[in-house]
Amino acid sequence: MGSLTGKRAIVTGAGSGIGRASARRFAEEGASVVAVDVSAEALAQTVAMIADAGGTAMAVTADVGDEDAVAGFVAACVEEFGGLDVIYANAGISGDGAPLLEQSVELWQEVLRVNLIGPFLCIKHAAPIMLAAGKGSIICTASVAGIRANAGGTPYSASKAGVISLVQTAANTFFNSGVRVNAICPGLIQTGITKSTFDRAKARGTEGKIGQLNPTRRPGQPNEIANMALFLASDEASYVNGQAFPVDGGLSSTHPFVPRG
């Protein structure tokens, strides 16, 4: 029996990267999964992977920054699977790499809409179902960029710092309810959102240096974040609440430096 057997879960940003890895991991451990993404094609691939492995999943194409869409996929989970036990608000965007003084208000609004308002809407619409049941796990993807300066672009970093505060506030709002709210703060993970970083390093012949600023001396992989998400989703994390967990190879544990050798 898997650690999520019988649970109903929603994973946003499930078309690739961390979201896909987490949706697959949840299904492997017995959850019925609603996979959400803006890309119908990518979602179809994720759901096919889950089905091929013997899991249960349905796809919902939706924009997490649209409240009606979020309400819709939460309702779809309840209708299809009979309830909601876990929601992983993972979908996010990086924005562009423009210098701070050249960034537009529109850029900030879009990054905040997806990265911060999206998790807020997931909490807003999922929590009432969990509160009525007296249990549930809400997980949000923040970032090491929300903990340490210079780990991400300005609007991205600000949005992820906001997610950490949102999680802490929500956990205390749902005091003594059985509903837990936590965040995962990934470091440099090899996903679509970091593809440009890896592509630039490859073009310069410095791909082997990626991740050298953390003590583990390498970048992370999506499944390593999915494993943390699985723990937080499971009953094994029953006493874990209101926390933001760096999964970054140790990057946030110290000041960056370039090791010798």
Positions of PLM-derived features:
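Alpha-helical segment proximal to the catalytic Tyr-Lys
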Residues: P128, N172-N176, S238
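Active-site helix of classical SDR
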Residues: I123, S159, V167
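C-terminal helical subdomain
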Residues: A183, R204-E236, V240, V247-G249
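Substrate-binding pocket helix/loop in short-chain dehydrogenase/reductase
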Residues: A98-L100, L107-Q109, I210
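Short C-terminal tail/terminal secondary-structure segment
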Residues: G97, L230, N241-G261
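Residue(s) in the substrate-gating loop at a strand-loop-helix junction
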Residues: S143
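Short, small/polar-rich loop/turn modules that mediate ligand/substrate recognition or access, typified
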Residues: G83, F175, R180, C185, ...
